């Protein structure tokens, strides 16, 4: 019966399981109203909830249309069987509102992997963007991934086009890649391919941003797949394509509907969009999208419909409007995530609110999205039947197949705020952080909610709660953050709280792992469990061991524990570990490890060494790996000082090498390293290897690497490496040596004998054989044939077997000195095979057999010769005892009191003799009983002198080698050195007593004597067997001058009274403090106290000092430096850990801060405490605090700062002025204002510091009667406003009645804005900032006019004088070079920085940018004509040049400088051919920022100046080049340059532009132009090559300059070779490497020995180099040449002048004698002829 009913139901309801967009079944409430038409009573029989449902269902009837009765009839049937079955369909459940429990069972309150079926749609935020996909996070912290192919159709088409391009360009890409690999390196070949490919893919960060909201649809959930297909990791794959997530009918596209859009194209006023709906296109205006300029075709975003017309939709991205909600839908398919809807509240429980949307789809708002966790509060806040405005965040399918919703009422979700809240949340409390005190806020079906503080909430999943003992005070740990829910994800489970790290990404790079469990071993690496099995890690093959293991499984057993270190953790959380001892056992303080590029930069800046591993070999070097997954490149040239052809020959894969970093470029992901040591260390290594004597030198080394058969060692602090072969580890058998090799640890210190060395490769061989070491110490180990030939045949010699052959055993004493043992002298029987009986490096004892003096060869024997026993020598008796009572050795024993004679008095002991053959010593601690007995505390033994006889007591023996006290254990003999005491108490006592550690107590007072100093400690001798250590800070005498040398304050042997602070029984000494020492603390230190402090750290701004007793103080830079011109590093670098005197400036006991001064009383830079210590015009020292856009702030002291505005920084115009001033830079300035501490200003202008201070006047400074020049600011009907010069933007009004004596009619006809005028002040009103001016001529008296004229003339004269001084200074500079003729070069060899602005064009009133170029041109023209003639004095030529320059400077300058356009035009009428006037006119326009007018003037000048005036035209062209270089573009400069080359001499124009580039510091441009000029004129012009060489050497490119010399010799004809080489040699002497210059000159004088002028120039350069010996040697060589008498006279005079300047009287006489001898010899030769 039941079966038939079900069958019939299926037939009657064929559409019952179809799409739910069909008309819903009629509610039972509706039928009830039809059946009961007239209910009793006047009120409605329905509850408010039922009324709301009726209204919703009526709306749905209208929405779907009431087509026929058939649709309603079958819908009513299931009601009859509602109670007979629990498995009702979704429509049945929707129709049944009475069974609320059953309805709630179909709801989904939380999202998890099990509820996200394919087709589920969600609203989420982008939480991460990678190269391959987007990571989108939803509610409850679940994340999914969007692949590149599921973004949009437009984006997919971009990928398809890219794929086609990649296929077509494969060959080109391969070729390009090979070129790149030749030029530089990448990390590995595999990574190359990945990087190349990923670099070509579109960068998703340009299309999307973190925090962006998107609607997504699930296309794959691996956790729901069958077990056969199930992957190891759960992963949700999503699509955000509009066609997949926008499920709308035409009727649903109404205002406020959220819609996902993809950008199709960018238009002028907006972007066209793809909305994924057939027949519809979208549009968004520019103004409606925040960063429209960043919008790209293919990008996807969530929009809000604002308008719909026909087939187009207009959207925006504003979701903040509270009215943005949908009120109608065409079907339930339109209810999708992202929409704002009204949820009809049906039930309220402790888990949240359940209800319906549009009366069709059930939904729930969880308590975490209501932020109300109590059921009572929920019922108080919300009422059943009310509507709640929510946004849908998930649309899922329940087990019955029904559509259910998860909604949110959180404000940030309603507004869709773009900020990703997890960023801020995890910045505050990162993953792994533990909250100690949390309170329970509430709970629902899956989560426990905790209150972390007033603002933050967290939730704990039921699986991570654990056992809660105290619910009021919980500890929880952060596991993550859910940005959509705005809530922390926590765990209260104790096992999570105890973990050190929660994720592998939290494990720091370089972490030492003491106990790693091996889980598998293979050739591809080792798998480990770390942190007690919490994480897995892998060991790459190259990091298994320092030595290559063929069978790693033999050494590393599964289940065993090993020690490792984390080398990297990749983005997926995979941990890589190294087991190499060289990396595992490295201490943090030994070598810093590279783990990040920032870390690498710090290591490079500090010039420190680090460790790297050889990863891959390349032809031009090898790729090395660091920690953190970083790779670097080690070029062949940097592997070793010797030439390296193939890196495999010098290194091996997986080898750990110590490197220095040459270049770190984080942007290019590039690190260049070197194994080569620095030049200083290379020199040190060279000296060390040369000083090593094989067979004699014993050194201490550290083990840095182990191989199968040897140990690699290194000399500390030198870096020289050597090898100890396993056979040389001891004299024992090879088996024992191999066992010893295994026990050796990296870093172990060894002492051994060098037996061989290679000075070329700087490598040595060592031996640890004790037999060889002992012989070497005794110097009995033979090194040469002479050491062997005279030995007796019974003398044993220790050696080792070098090699074995048929001839016998070749036995070596060191690597080069070898003898032969014949087989018959090696073994007893010929049947024994010596190759099996012996092995290489075996220790042997040999005896001399035969020698061959002729060939210096010798034979040895392993068999000892038979020798007769010698008779035992009888020991002699005691000789000449000092104490006559001593007759024999038996009279001397422990406790004996005897007389002794002082042999010598040392600072800390008395050396005595008891007999002629018996010596002893009295330690200073055994002289005095008490401190008071000592008269001279610094030299206690000064009262004793040589040959004094003293009474002493024998207390023990003294070990001469170890300098230690030894008890007497055998009979005293002449070999003994006795330890004696002369203490009065000891002489009286019958017992022998020496103060030892056992009888010392803490607090006991002792007398100690300084034995030595070590760093910041003194070592004291308390007794011969007891030492004490005392810190300098713990000495009682705080007045000690610690700035002096410690040895002078506490000399050796000086006496101190100390107290025992602690006892170090392990090392056998006591720690002491001064007797009157008081432990300092914050409460005892007062301002003004002078305390000793130990320098701990030098920072950029301060010095940190240790005052003792864990009290530290800080000395600010202005309180630390005696001279501000030094940096803290320069002043205190050599004082780190030294104790220096300090003065307390302030004590902040609350913040535990002490400020100190390190400045002496007579500091070079005076102390400034407030503005009262300053006065205007005073010059002060300062240190730059910081730099901002308005100027720089300067420290004058710790509390006083000053400000320097940009206008006061420099006399020159500095375009990029900020790069000239850095924090903590020293500056010298002059005080401008100092009214208050907060209003101190300085000027750094050199002209104002050295001259008068130009203080701009303000309204309050101006008085009636003052005369000013100014500029017309504006012209009105009632007067003109004038901006006054030399004021702070002061403007005054000249009324129309004060313009002229006769009132003008039209002011605009007389004046224009910018005209220059002179005005007199009539009256001022500073309060209102008003000034009345007059321009009337009658107001200016004759005296005023005269004064003004005088002032103007004086100013002009000063300018001329300054210019003249500059030119004279330059000329004088050249004149100083004239003796060596280097001043005649086209290129000045000395530092030639021109006194012009850095831009190449100065707009100052002086206007010097044309004349200086003109001077330069004249100098170059004249220099080409000069020849190297040593006999001609050329100073007159320079003098004439100076006069010409001055004359050019003053030509055509009137007594009054032109001040307007009219003035210049008037000047041009009289001087149309004067380039100076034209250029001044151009400069005037440039001052007014009229650049285009300046260009027009230049063109006018070229047309106006007569064609014969080439020099004047040249000046205009140069001015145009200057103008375009400063104010134009590259194109305009190139155009002017090309034209100038056509009209003027091309070479001259090239050289002028080169000069302009250098002056304006455009060095790259200059380098390019040098190359082009040399190519064009290099075959005929020597000067261009010299200029190019000068340019390169000036910029520290000496090697490139030497290449240029080679190119010059190829390009120039042979006749010019000597000249160009000579000039390059002069350049090397002046700016480069003088040794290189000498080499060039030596080559010249060798090729042309008769060119005396070359010898003259050579001498001049050596004189400038100030190497007296070389100058004298050169003169000696010259006078031996065949030279004329005139030339000889010249050189002798020159030599004599040199020696007189040196003041060497002895050499002066020698030169005179040499000259006399020369004259005499030539006179005799002449007479003979």
Curated annotation (Swiss-Prot):
Disulfide bonds: none annotated. This is rRNA biogenesis protein RRP5. SMART domains: HAT, S1. Its main location: nucleus. Interacts with snoRNA U3. Interacts with MPP10. Component of the ribosomal small subunit (SSU) processome composed of at least 40 protein subunits and snoRNA U3. HAT repeats lie at residues 1455-1487, 1561-1594, 1632-1664, 1666-1701. CDD domains: S1_like, S1_Rrp5_repeat_hs11_sc8, S1_Rrp5_repeat_hs12_sc9, S1_Rrp5_repeat_hs1_sc1, S1_Rrp5_repeat_hs2_sc2, S1_Rrp5_repeat_hs6_sc5, S1_Rrp5_repeat_hs8_sc7, S1_Rrp5_repeat_sc10. Residues 78-88 have a biased composition (Basic residues). The modification Phosphoserine is found at residues 187-188, 1724. It comes from Saccharomyces cerevisiae (strain ATCC 204508 / S288c). It comes from the Eukaryota. Keywords: Nucleus, Phosphoprotein, Repeat, Ribonucleoprotein, Ribosome biogenesis, rRNA processing. Residues 1-45, 64-101, 166-196, 1344-1403, 1417-1444 are annotated as: Disordered. The modification Phosphothreonine is found at residue 47. Residues 119-200, 338-410, 510-580, 607-676, 690-769, 794-863, 895-971, 1003-1083, 1088-1159, 1177-1245, 1265-1336 form the S1 motif domain. GO terms for biological process: 90S preribosome assembly; endonucleolytic cleavage in 5'-ETS of tricistronic rRNA transcript (SSU-rRNA, 5.8S rRNA, LSU-rRNA); endonucleolytic cleavage in ITS1 to separate SSU-rRNA from 5.8S rRNA and LSU-rRNA from tricistronic rRNA transcript (SSU-rRNA, 5.8S rRNA, LSU-rRNA); endonucleolytic cleavage in ITS1 upstream of 5.8S rRNA from tricistronic rRNA transcript (SSU-rRNA, 5.8S rRNA, LSU-rRNA); endonucleolytic cleavage to generate mature 5'-end of SSU-rRNA from (SSU-rRNA, 5.8S rRNA, LSU-rRNA); maturation of SSU-rRNA; rRNA processing. Residues 22-31 have a biased composition (Polar residues). Involved in the biogenesis of rRNA. Required for the formation of 18S and 5.8S rRNA. Present with 8860 molecules/cell in log phase SD medium. It is found in: Nucleus, Nucleolus. PROSITE patterns: S1 (PS50126). One of its GO terms (molecular function) is mRNA binding.
């Amino acid at each position: 019966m039941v079966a038939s009913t079900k069958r019939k139901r299926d037939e009657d309801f064929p559409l019952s399981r179809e799409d739910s967009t069909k008309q819903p079944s009629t509610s039972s409430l509706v039928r009830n109203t039809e059946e009961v038409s007239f209910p009793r009573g006047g009120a409605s029989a329905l509850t408010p909830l039922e009324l709301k449902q009726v209204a919703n269902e009526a709306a749905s009837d209208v929405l779907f249309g009431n087509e026929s009765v058939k649709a309603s009839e079958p819908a009513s049937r299931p009601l009859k069987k509602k109670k007979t079955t629990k498995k009702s369909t979704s429509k049945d459940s929707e129709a049944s509102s009475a069974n609320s429990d059953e309805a709630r069972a179909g709801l989904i309150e939380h999202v998890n992997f099990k509820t996200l079926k394919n087709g589920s749609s969600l609203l989420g935020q982008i939480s991460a963007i990678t190269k391959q996909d987007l990571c989108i996070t939803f509610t409850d912290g679940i994340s999914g991934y969007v692949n590149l192919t599921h973004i949009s159709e437009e984006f997919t088409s971009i990928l398809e086009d890219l794929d086609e391009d990649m296929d077509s360009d494969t060959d080109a890409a391969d070729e390009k890649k090979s070129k790149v690999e030749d030029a530089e390196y990448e990390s590995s070949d595999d990574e190359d391919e990945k990087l190349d490919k990923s670099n070509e893919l579109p960068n998703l960060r340009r299309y999307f941003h973190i925090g962006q909201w998107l609607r997504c649809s699930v296309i794959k959930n691996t956790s729901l797949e069958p077990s056969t297909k199930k992957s190891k990791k759960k992963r949700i794959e999503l699509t955000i394509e509009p066609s997949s997530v926008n499920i709308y009918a035409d009727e649903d596209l109404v205002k406020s509907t959220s819609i996902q859009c993809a950008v199709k194209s960018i238009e002028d006023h907006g972007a066209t969009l793809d909305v994924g709906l057939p027949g519809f296109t979208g549009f968004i205006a520019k103004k409606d999208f925040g960063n429209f300029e960043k919008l790209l075709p293919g990008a996807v975003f969530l929009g809000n419909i604002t308008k719909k017309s026909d087939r187009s939709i207009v959207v925006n991205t504003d979701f903040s409007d509270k009215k943005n909600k949908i009120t109608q839908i065409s079907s339930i398919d339109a209810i999708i995530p992202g929409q704002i809807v009204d949820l009809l509240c049906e039930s309220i429980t402790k888990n949240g609110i359940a209800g319906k949307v549009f009366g069709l789809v059930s939904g729930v708002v969880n308590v975490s999205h209501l932020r109300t966790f109590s059921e009572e509060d929920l019922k108080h806040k919300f009422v059943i039947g009310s509507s709640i405005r929510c946004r849908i965040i998930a649309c899922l399918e329940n087990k019955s197949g029904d559509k259910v919703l998860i909604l949110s009422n959180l404000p940030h979700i309603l507004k869709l705020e773009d900020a990703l809240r997890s960023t801020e949340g995890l910045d505050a409390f990162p993953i792994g952080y533990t909250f100690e005190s949390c309170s329970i806020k509430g709970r629902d079906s899956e989560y426990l909610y905790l209150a972390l503080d007033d603002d933050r909430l967290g939730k704990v999943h039921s699986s991570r709660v654990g056992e809660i003992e105290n619910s009021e005070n919980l500890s929880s740990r952060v596991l993550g953050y859910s940005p959509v829910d705005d809530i922390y994800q926590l765990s209260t489970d104790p096992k999570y709280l105890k973990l050190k790290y929660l994720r592998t990404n939290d494990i720091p790079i370089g972490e030492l792992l003491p106990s790693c469990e091996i889980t598998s071993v293979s050739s591809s690496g080792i798998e480990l469990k770390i942190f007690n099995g919490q994480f897995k890690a892998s060991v790459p093959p190259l990091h298994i061991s320092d030595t290559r293991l063929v069978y790693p499984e033999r050494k590393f057993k599964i289940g065993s524990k090993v020690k490792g270190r984390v080398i990297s953790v990749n983005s997926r959380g995979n941990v890589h570990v190294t087991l190499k001892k060289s990396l595992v056992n490295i201490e943090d303080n030994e070598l810093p490890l590279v783990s990040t590029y920032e870390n690498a930069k710090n290591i490079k800046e500090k010039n420190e060494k680090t460790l790297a591993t050889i990863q891959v070999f390349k032809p031009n070097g090898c790729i090395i790996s660091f920690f953190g997954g970083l790779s670097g490149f080690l070029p062949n040239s940097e592997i070793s000082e010797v030439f390296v052809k193939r890196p495999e020959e010098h290194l091996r894969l997986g080898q750990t090498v110590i490197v220095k970093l040459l270049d770190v470029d984080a942007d290019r992901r590039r690190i260049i390293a070197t194994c080569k040591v620095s030049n200083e260390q290379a020199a040190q290594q060279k000296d060390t290897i040369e000083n090593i004597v094989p067979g004699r030198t014993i050194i201490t080394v550290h083990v840095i690497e182990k191989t199968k058969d040897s140990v690699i060692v290194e000399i500390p602090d030198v870096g020289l490496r050597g090898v100890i072969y396993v056979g040389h580890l001891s004299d024992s058998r090879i088996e024992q040596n191999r066992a010893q090799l295994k026990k050796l640890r990296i870093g172990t210190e060894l002492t051994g004998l060098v037996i061989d060395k290679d000075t070329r490769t700087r490598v040595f061989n060592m031996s640890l054989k004790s037999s060889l070491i002992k012989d070497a110490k005794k110097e009995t180990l033979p090194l040469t044939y002479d050491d062997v030939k005279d030995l007796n045949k019974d003398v044993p010699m220790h050696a080792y077997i070098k090699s074995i052959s048929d001839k016998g055993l070749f036995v070596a004493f060191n690597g080069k000195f070898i003898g032969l043992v014949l087989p018959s002298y090696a073994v007893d029987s010929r049947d024994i095979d010596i190759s099996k009986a012996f092995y290489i490096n075996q220790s042997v004892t040999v005896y001399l057999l035969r020698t061959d003096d002729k060939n210096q060869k010798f034979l040895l024997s392993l068999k000892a010769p038979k020798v007769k026993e010698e008779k035992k020598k009888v020991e002699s008796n005691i000789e000449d005892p000092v104490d006559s009572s001593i007759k024999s050795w038996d009279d001397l024993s422990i406790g004996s009191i005897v007389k002794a004679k002082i042999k010598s008095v040392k600072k800390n002991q008395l050396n005595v003799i008891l007999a002629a053959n018996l010596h002893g010593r009295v330690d200073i601690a055994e002289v005095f009983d008490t401190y008071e007995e000592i008269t001279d505390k610094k030299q206690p033994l000064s009262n004793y002198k040589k040959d004094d006889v003293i009474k002493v007591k024998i207390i023990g023996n003294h070990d001469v080698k170890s300098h230690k006290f030894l008890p007497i254990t055998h009979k005293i003999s002449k070999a003994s050195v006795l330890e004696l005491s002369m203490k009065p108490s000891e002489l009286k006592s019958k017992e022998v007593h020496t103060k030892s550690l056992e009888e010392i107590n803490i607090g006991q007072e002792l007398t100690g004597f300084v034995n030595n100093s070590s760093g910041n400690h003194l070592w004291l001798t308390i007794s011969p067997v007891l030492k004490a250590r005392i810190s300098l800070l713990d000495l009682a005498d705080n007045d000690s001058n610690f700035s002096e040398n410690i040895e002078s304050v506490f000399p050796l042997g000086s006496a101190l009274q100390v107290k025992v602070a602690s006892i170090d029984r392990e090392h056998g000494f006591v720690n002491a403090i001064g007797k009157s020492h008081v432990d300092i603390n914050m409460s005892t230190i007062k301002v003004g106290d002078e305390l000793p402090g130990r320098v701990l750290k030098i920072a950029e701004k301060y010095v940190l000092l240790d005052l003792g007793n864990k009290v530290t103080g800080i000395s600010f830079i202005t309180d630390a430096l005696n001279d501000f011109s030094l940096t803290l590093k320069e002043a205190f670098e050599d004082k780190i850990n030294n104790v220096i005197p300090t003065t307390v400036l302030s004590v902040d006991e609350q913040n535990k801060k002490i400020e100190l001064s390190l400045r002496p009383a007579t500091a070079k830079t005076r102390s400034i405490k407030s503005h009262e210590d300053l006065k205007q015009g005073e010059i002060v020292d300062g240190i730059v605090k910081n730099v901002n856009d308005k100027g720089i702030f300067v420290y004058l002291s710790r509390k006083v700062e000053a400000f320097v505005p940009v206008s006061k920084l420099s006399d020159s115009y500095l375009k990029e002025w900020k790069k000239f001033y850095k924090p903590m830079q020293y500056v010298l300035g002059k005080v401008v204002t100092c009214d208050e501490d907060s209003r101190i200003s300085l000027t750094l202008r050199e002209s104002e510091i050295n001259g008068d201070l130009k203080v701009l006047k303000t309204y309050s400074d101006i008085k009636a009667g003052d005369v000013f020049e100014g500029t017309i600011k504006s012209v009105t009907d009632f007067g003109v406003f004038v901006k006054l010069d030399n004021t702070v933007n002061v403007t005054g009004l000249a009324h129309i009645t004060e313009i002229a004596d006769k009132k003008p009619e039209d002011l605009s006809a007389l004046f224009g804005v910018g005209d220059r005028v002179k005005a007199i002040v009539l009256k001022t009103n500073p309060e209102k900032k008003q000034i009345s001016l007059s321009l009337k001529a009658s107001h200016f008296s004759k005296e005023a006019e005269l004064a003004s004229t005088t002032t103007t003339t004086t100013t002009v004269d000063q300018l001329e004088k300054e210019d003249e001084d500059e030119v004279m200074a330059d000329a004088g500079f050249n004149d100083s070079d004239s003796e060596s003729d280097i001043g005649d070069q086209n290129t000045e060899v000395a530092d030639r920085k021109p006194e012009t602005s850095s831009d190449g064009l100065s707009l100052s009133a002086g206007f010097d940018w044309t004349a200086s170029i003109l001077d330069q041109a004249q100098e170059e023209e004249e220099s080409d004509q000069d020849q190297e003639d040593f006999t001609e004095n050329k100073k007159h030529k320079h003098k004439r040049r100076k006069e010409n320059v001055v004359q050019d400077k003053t030509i055509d300058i009137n007594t009054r400088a032109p001040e307007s356009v009219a003035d210049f035009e008037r000047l041009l009428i009289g001087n149309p051919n004067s380039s100076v006037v034209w250029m001044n006119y151009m400069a005037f326009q440039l001052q007014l920022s009229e650049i285009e007018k300046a260009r027009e003037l230049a063109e006018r000048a070229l047309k106006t100046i007569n064609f014969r005036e080439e020099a004047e035209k040249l000046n205009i062209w140069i001015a145009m080049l200057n103008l375009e270089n400063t104010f134009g573009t590259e194109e305009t400069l190139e155009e002017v340059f090309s034209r100038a080359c056509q009209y003027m001499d091309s070479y001259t124009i090239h050289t002028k532009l080169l000069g302009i580039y250098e002056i304006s510091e455009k060095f790259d441009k200059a380098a390019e132009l040098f190359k082009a000029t040399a190519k064009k004129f290099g075959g005929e012009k020597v000067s261009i090559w010299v200029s190019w060489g000068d340019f390169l050497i000036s910029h520290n490119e000496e090697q490139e300059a030497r290449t240029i010399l080679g190119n010059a010799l190829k390009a120039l004809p042979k006749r010019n070779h000597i000249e160009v080489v000579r000039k390059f040699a002069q350049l090397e002497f002046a700016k480069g490497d003088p040794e290189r210059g000498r080499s060039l000159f030596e080559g010249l004088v060798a090729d042309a020995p008769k060119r005396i002028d070359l010898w003259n120039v050579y001498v001049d350069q050596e004189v400038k180099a100030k190497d007296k010996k070389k100058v004298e040697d050169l003169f000696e060589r010259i006078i031996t040449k065949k030279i004329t008498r005139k030339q000889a006279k010249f050189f002798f005079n020159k030599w004599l002048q040199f020696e007189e300047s040196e003041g060497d009287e002895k050499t002066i006489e020698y030169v005179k004698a040499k000259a006399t001898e020369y004259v005499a010899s030539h006179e005799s030769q002449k007479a003979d002829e």
